[in-house]
From Swiss-Prot:
SMART domains: AdoHcyase (SM00996), AdoHcyase_NAD (SM00997)
Segment forming the signal sequence: none
Disulfide bonds listed in the record: none
Protein name: Adenosylhomocysteinase
Cellular component, GO annotation: cytosol
Residues the entry annotates as binding substrate: 60, 135, 195, 225, 229
UniProt GO MF annotations: adenosylhomocysteinase activity
Organism: Hyphomonas neptunium (strain ATCC 15444)
Cofactor: how bound: Binds 1 NAD(+) per subunit.
Domain of life of the organism encoding this protein: Bacteria
Gene transcribed to yield this protein: ahcY
Length: 469
């Protein structure tokens, strides 16, 4: 069932795009075998009946398939995008037209973004959600910091970025409109499942400080998410985004990737596969050694800035590309980010210079010495801002994990402490297994003797929890 709410309990760019969205959703379903298998397996038992899910995750065609899967399993859903540029408007229209409360369009302002996040939590019957499905942690942090402000709002007067200015302003609005709302709403949440590295890091920090208010399932570190979505997804979507944004010839160019985690590995492979000569920066000696042995030059951003043509940040950290770095670049260097937040690049510092908008999500910044850079998606996620994100097939694995996590939290959330958990190995293997037939993969089967020899069951799990893949 869907969250059939009051008329106009949604905001999308153009509801007439719904039919176009439905056609693409139908195509995506054929590429998302994990989610379709979840509907078949769990649909009859309705394990999410009674679940009231607030979802903050890129409102794409693939996410539409996830939303409709959650609803097919019994949930009521309200949704926003977790990035101002990542919505696919026809996907949002199709979901809204089907009766789901969704508040998202491509090109939101920061004020709208936080207003929509608040509206996602406002159920028509006055009750709140009992589950959160998050990507980056914004929905979770809205409740946590909002409750903090109910007892001491002084920090709201000290935003440290443009993003925080609008974030804190929205908290103030809700404090004025509904005193005590944050505490009440947070108390009703059984748990959160988190999609991405940045959001998971926030959750672990909260747990470490003893401030995590409910159980959390770290979907990002499921092997069938991080080793597939983060790596193989970026491997296909990064170059797609840069090409759509700039029409640049990759072959022969020097491309630099900051960070060599799973996202950085996929990004470097993407650029190298297009003929670019790739360099990498890293703080972790293990990842740096991996990059070197994968054939990439490893150097610092200070060294790379004047030498390379294309720059991609993929660290999950802040201030990776500073204004000084960008001023040192070649004329017309291309700058983009594939990490979750835009603070990997010092975009606010660039506001002091001349901006020329070339087309949506493509800007040229001119420095006083006449040199220019091309900035994609204002430093936000380039693969969703300048292209359509990861392909459906790889997102099927990620979103099947999300579905399993939501079922677990709904049925057994009260059995968990307020800590961060990962899904067990047998579910990781199950998600992978669901995607093999689509690729024509035939698994080898262990004999009883072989299984006993290595100490596993014939049907798995085949690796210990600590295995790194």
């Amino acid at each position: 069932m869907s969250a059939k709410a009051a008329p106009q309990d949604y905001f999308v760019k153009d509801i007439s795009l719904a039919e176009y969205g439905r056609k693409e959703i139908a195509i995506a379903e054929t590429e998302m075998p994990g989610l379709m298998a979840a509907r078949e397996e769990f649909g009859p038992s309705q394990p999410l009946k009674g679940a009231r899910i607030c979802g903050s995750l890129h409102m794409t065609i693939q996410t539409a398939v996830l939303i409709q899967t959650l609803e097919a399993l019994g949930a009521q859903v309200r949704w926003v995008s977790c990035n101002i540029y990542s919505t696919q408007d026809h996907a949002a229209a199709a979901i809204a037209d089907a009766g789901t409360a969704v508040f998202a369009y491509k090109g939101e302002t920061l004020e709208e973004y936080w207003d929509y996040t608040d509206r996602m939590f406002q159920w028509p019957d006055g009750e709140g959600p009992n589950l959160i499905l998050d990507d980056g942690g914004d929905a979770t942090m809205y409740l946590i910091l909002g409750e903090k402000a109910e007892s001491d709002p002084s920090f709201l007067e000290k935003p440290t970025s443009e993003e925080e200015k609008y974030f804190f302003a929205q908290i103030k609005k809700r404090l004025t409109a509904s005193p005590g709302w944050f505490k009440k709403t947070k108390a009703g949440v059984r748990g959160v499942s988190e999609e991405t590295t940045t959001g998971v890091n926030r959750l672990y920090q909260l747990e470490k400080r003893g401030e995590l208010p409910f159980p959390a399932i770290n979907v990002n570190d499921s092997v069938t998410k991080s080793k597939f979505d983060n790596k193989y997804g970026c491997k296909e979507s990064l170059v797609d985004a840069i090409r759509r944004g700039t029409d640049v010839m990759m072959a022969g160019k020097k491309a630099f990737v900051a960070g060599y985690g799973d996202v950085g590995k996929g990004s470097a492979a993407s650029l190298a596969g297009s003929g670019a000569r790739v360099g990498v920066s890293e703080v972790d000696p293990i990842c740096a050694l991996q990059a070197a042995m994968d054939g990439f030059e490893v150097l610092t951003m200070d060294e790379a800035a004047p030498k390379f043509d294309i720059f991609v940040t993929a660290t999950g950290n802040k201030d990776i590309l500073t204004v000084d770095h960008m001023r040192a670049m070649k004329d017309m260097a291309i700058v983009c980010n594939i990490g979750h937040f835009d603070n990997e690049i010092q975009v606010e510092g660039l506001r002091n210079f001349q901006w020329t908008n070339i087309k949506p999500q493509v800007d040229m910044i001119t420095f006083p010495d006449g040199k220019r850079i091309i900035l994609l998606s204002e430093g936000r996620l380039v693969n969703l801002g300048n292209a359509t994100g990861h392909p459906s097939f790889v997102m099927s694995a990620s979103f099947t994990n999300q579905t399993l996590a939501q079922i677990e939290l709904h049925l057994r959330g009260n059995e968990y402490d307020n800590k961060v958990y990962t899904l067990p190995k047998h579910l990781d293997e199950k998600v992978a297994r669901l995607h093999l037939d689509k690729l024509g993969v035939q698994l080898t089967k262990l004999s009883g003797e072989q299984a006993a020899y290595i100490g596993v069951e014939q049907t798995g799990p085949f690796k210990p929890e600590h295995y790194r893949y």
